[in-house]
């Protein structure tokens, strides 16, 4: 999708030394996937087909979200799923291509919207942790939505949220151990409470720098 933000990011990436640019407009013909494979990790992006682009159209925000490629990062027998703004339309397409597999960590689609992270999607991948990136204030969409959080809670998936926990770092070490660290204190039950129906003037601290980081640590030797 064309945007000024994407154009600026792409130009910045081109200026990085030794940076290989891989575009999802030219995926593998057999799998329609982008595979980046190194000796220590494997990253697979499941991209929409050209026919999907042609038939689906991009005339609404929902349709634009439905072309988000979903990626799975594999490292030391651990799997982390990255979903962008994926929703109920492209989640089934990815499930059909991966089959039923276990994934350890989910970056929840579309900031925890109720149109993403549906029951059949969660049951297909058996996640243990869920990471939600959402604003701490000025959140007019009330993300994450309660319906989404209820689905995660029903499966006892530990939820981490940038609005409650600040910066979140997910690390996988050389032995495959997962460690999640947060800028602010983590409260399991508090993170199951959504913003649906709450007034927009919340008593939360706005932090525009809140981010989620995924780190593989073998190269650092610990």
Place the predicted regions along the sequence by residue:
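Non-globular, low-confidence helical/coil segments that flank catalytic cores
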Residues: 1-222
